[in-house]
């Protein structure tokens, strides 16, 4: 949005320089791209050509004697329209123009002391200019005063700020909106807009019928003027349009653009004599065709809004009118449209057809009061500058609330959100500056927000306004003091992370999105997966249920780069749908492969028992000692059936442990997956503490050869029972399978730790317990003690 200082001064007079105004607007949230003069040229004067002779050494150059008020200068000029008696724009030596600095010089042997200028050479964009303004010097009126500033005489002495507005501030896409914003900053009142005009005879309702057949047009107004004279616009209108970035065309077209810039409401004019007896609004038909003002045939869809008459579509609502009802130079009678259309549909159509100043305003939403205002302002200007006569009556379709919004808010809430202490009077004064009316109700204030501020709808919007006008720079920075406490789940997860890190595992963080084909792997659970509607790739198309596929991708990434010793864990979310309800579970997943450094100070190949030991460390740490057990049932097919188990606590399955099936990979990969969300629902046993023994313990190893179908868990139960209270710790540290042990046999080795809190154990005592353990295991499991 380009803000012309001269334009906005009709409504508010600000004495600050243009850069200060721009900075203050930025201070309340309205950033600008540039600020400066419309014509950035200096040392220019109005001159009169006293003599004009052909250059002695050129067939197109002229040697002119030019009166500039203080002296007569000789200037060589190549413009075809230069002649004696012409009033011209003279750039004196030292003048700064967009094309460079003007200096005294010699042109083909003749001295030249300046330059006679065209409007184009002053820096105006060619799109604003006529052909003669580009190809020849500018011809000033005969009454132009010699020696005066031509920029001021031409009323081009304007200043412009080019703003980069946020999408929510559609109200600032108007001079009036900018005036109200400046009024709030400078505490100045905004002048009223002139809407006066004479009411003529007759009534438009007797000539034209309005039909609105779609909810996409909540407000539509139409009025008529007759006996219009189409001619060049007054200078001030043309210059203000140029300053705003719009090319002047003629007085009628320029007035429609002028009113749009002034009020923010786009208008459209129809040639009334070509319109017919019906004016309506409807949705377009698929493949319907319309020739627009740019003489382009458009193929429409049923999401486009069209204006129509008895013959068919005559305009693309909010975008561009149709060629069949175009206002031309011989047009005498005009029907004026001022309306509001669905902003979403306008944006959709504008992206297909044309982005314009009008569509930009429709897309951001319009104030219905301005729709009426723009109509009246248009009649006012057409009457003044196009000699129009207004026809009585107005066609009106209204299905929209035009009331101002009322929002009640507590003073304390404003201060709490802003983090400052403003007294009641300061807050009320800020609302007054914004032209909001208020009703003080003690602890709260009822604020009536003008309908032009469509961006304000809730209490927090009012807080933002107070903060903006008070000044963000005036709000002192404070350290945030928040009563944040870490939740129980977060504490537990952090503790698990510390534990596993101390056990030598590395934490990883993987994508929650995986291939759809992997979602139902590593589980036998029944659920529906959650797929993205429009995934970027199939690799990241579906939210995961198990984290194992994610960790396997990390494993593949590492092994492909030569790292084969991988011990990872992740705590992350899993996602699924059951009975049309979406769920999220938190899971702990561990992957181990290659070499693992154990407590004995030696590197050992990862096996099931090392993995199981990590699992039990976690479960014991969480307080589930002696409550978990394993079952070789309900196992996913991706795990090796002989080296895997389901994990249970209190008859509830909480996870799985096992080796990845050889059909999936030949690598020895072991995984654990625990559903932490399920564990939260299982009451943790009260932690019991016992005094650390003052006396040393004794560690002994024992190994058995037994049937390979006997689990280590069964053997551990037997060892615990035989070992009694003095056996305080049991760990499986080796599994050995070899043909020398027998076809269906395996060797299990256990580390046993004995301790008495009251004394030092003797060798005889340990030997007695040790022998009892060996005998009981041999009897119960048909095992043999392995001696080597």
Mark where each language-model region is.
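Beta-rich nucleic-acid/ligand-interaction surfaces
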Residues: 39-43, 199, 484-488, 510-528, ...
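A carboxyl-terminal module marker
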Residues: 2, 433-439, 446, 455, ...
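Phosphate-backbone binding interfaces of nucleic-acid-interacting proteins
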Residues: 1-202, 335, 351-352, 357, ...
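Mobile "lid/hinge" segments at catalytic clefts and subdomain interfaces of large enzymes
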Residues: 111-123, 132-136, 305-406, 558, ...
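Terminal amphipathic helices with adjacent charged low-complexity linkers/tails
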Residues: 182, 186-211, 386-414
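Conserved mixed alpha/beta core segments that line enzyme active sites in large multi-domain catalysts
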Residues: 46-76, 239, 243, 250, ...
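Extended, well-folded interaction surfaces typified by the phenylalanyl-tRNA synthetase beta subunit core
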Residues: 407-564, 753-755, 765-788
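Glycine/proline-enriched, intrinsically flexible loops and inter-domain linkers
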Residues: 5, 28, 62, 186, ...
């Amino acid at each position: 949005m380009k803000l012309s200082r001269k334009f906005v001064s009709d409504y508010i007079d600000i004495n600050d320089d243009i850069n200060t105004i721009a900075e203050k607007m930025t201070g309340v949230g309205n950033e600008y791209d540039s600020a400066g003069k419309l014509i950035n040229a200096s040392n220019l004067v109005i001159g009169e050509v006293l003599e004009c002779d052909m250059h002695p050494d050129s067939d197109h150059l002229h040697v002119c004697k030019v009166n500039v008020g203080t002296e007569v200068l000789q200037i060589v000029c190549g413009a075809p329209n230069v002649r004696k008696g012409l009033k011209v724009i003279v750039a004196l030596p030292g003048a700064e123009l967009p094309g460079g600095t003007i200096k005294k010089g010699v042109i083909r042997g003749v001295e030249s002391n300046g330059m006679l200028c065209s409007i184009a050479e002053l820096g105006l964009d060619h799109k604003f200019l006529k052909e003669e303004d580009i190809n020849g010097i500018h011809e000033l009126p005969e009454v132009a005063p010699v020696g005066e500033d031509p920029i001021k005489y031409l009323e081009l002495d304007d200043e412009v700020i080019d703003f980069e507005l946020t999408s929510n501030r559609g109200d600032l896409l108007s001079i009036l909106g900018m005036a109200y914003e400046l009024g709030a900053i400078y505490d100045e009142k905004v002048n009223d807009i002139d809407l006066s005009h004479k009411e003529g005879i007759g009534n438009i309702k007797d000539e034209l019928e309005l039909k609105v057949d779609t909810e996409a047009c909540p407000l539509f107004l139409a009025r008529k003027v007759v006996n219009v004279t189409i001619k060049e616009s007054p200078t001030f209108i043309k210059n203000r349009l140029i300053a705003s970035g719009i090319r002047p065309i003629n007085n009628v077209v320029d007035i429609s653009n002028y009113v749009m810039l002034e009020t923010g409401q786009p208008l459209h004019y129809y040639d009334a004599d070509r319109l017919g007896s019906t004016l309506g609004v409807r949705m377009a038909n698929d493949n319907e065709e319309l020739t627009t003002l740019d003489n382009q045939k458009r193929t429409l869809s049923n999401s486009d809004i069209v204006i129509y008459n008895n013959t068919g579509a005559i305009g693309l609502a909010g975008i561009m009118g149709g060629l069949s009802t175009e206002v031309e130079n011989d047009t005498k009678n005009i029907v004026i449209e001022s309306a509001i259309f669905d902003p979403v549909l306008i944006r959709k159509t504008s992206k297909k057809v044309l982005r314009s100043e009008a569509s930009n305003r429709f897309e951001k939403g319009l104030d219905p009061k301005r729709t009426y205002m723009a109509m009246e302002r248009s009649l006012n200007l057409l009457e003044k500058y196009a000699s129009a006569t207004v026809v009585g009556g107005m066609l009106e379709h209204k299905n929209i609330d035009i009331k101002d919004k009322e929002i009640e808010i507590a003073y304390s809430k404003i201060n709490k959100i802003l983090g400052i202490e403003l007294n009641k009077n300061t807050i009320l004064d800020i609302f007054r500056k914004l032209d909001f009316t208020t009703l003080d109700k003690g602890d709260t204030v009822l604020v009536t927000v003008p309908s032009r501020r469509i961006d304000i709808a809730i209490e927090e919007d009012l807080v933002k306004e107070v903060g903006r006008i008070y000044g963000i720079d005036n709000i002192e920075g404070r350290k945030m003091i928040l009563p944040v406490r870490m939740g129980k789940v977060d504490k537990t997860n952090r503790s698990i992370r510390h534990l596993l890190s101390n056990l030598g595992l590395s934490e990883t963080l993987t994508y929650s999105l995986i291939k759809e084909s992997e979602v139902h792997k590593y589980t036998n659970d029944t659920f529906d997966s959650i797929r993205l509607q429009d995934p970027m790739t199939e690799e990241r198309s579906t939210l995961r249920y198990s984290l194992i596929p994610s960790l396997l991708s990390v494993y593949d990434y590492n092994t492909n780069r030569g790292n084969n010793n991988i011990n990872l864990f992740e705590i992350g979310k899993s996602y699924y749908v059951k009975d049309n309800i979406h769920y999220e579970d938190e899971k702990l997943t561990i992957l181990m492969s290659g070499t693992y450094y154990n407590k004995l100070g030696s590197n050992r190949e990862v096996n099931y028992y090392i993995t199981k030991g990590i699992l039990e460390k976690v479960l014991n740490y969480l307080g589930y000692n002696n409550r978990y057990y394993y079952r070789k049932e309900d196992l996913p097919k991706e795990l090796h059936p002989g080296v895997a188990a389901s994990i249970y606590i209190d008859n509830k399955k909480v996870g799985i442990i096992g080796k990845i099936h050889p059909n999936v990979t030949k690598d020895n990969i072991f995984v654990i997956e625990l559903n932490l969300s399920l564990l939260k629902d299982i009451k943790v046993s009260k932690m019991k503490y016992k005094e650390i023994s003052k006396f040393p313990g004794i560690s002994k190893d024992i190994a058995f050869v037994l049937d390979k179908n006997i689990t280590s868990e069964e053997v551990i139960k037997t060892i615990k029972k035989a070992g009694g209270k003095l056996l305080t710790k049991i760990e499986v540290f080796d599994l050995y399978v070899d043909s020398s042990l027998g076809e269906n046999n395996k060797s299990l080795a256990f580390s046993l730790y004995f301790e008495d809190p009251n004394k030092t154990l003797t060798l005889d005592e340990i030997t007695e317990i040790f022998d009892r353990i060996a005998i009981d295991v041999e009897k119960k499991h048909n095992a043999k003690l392995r001696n080597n």
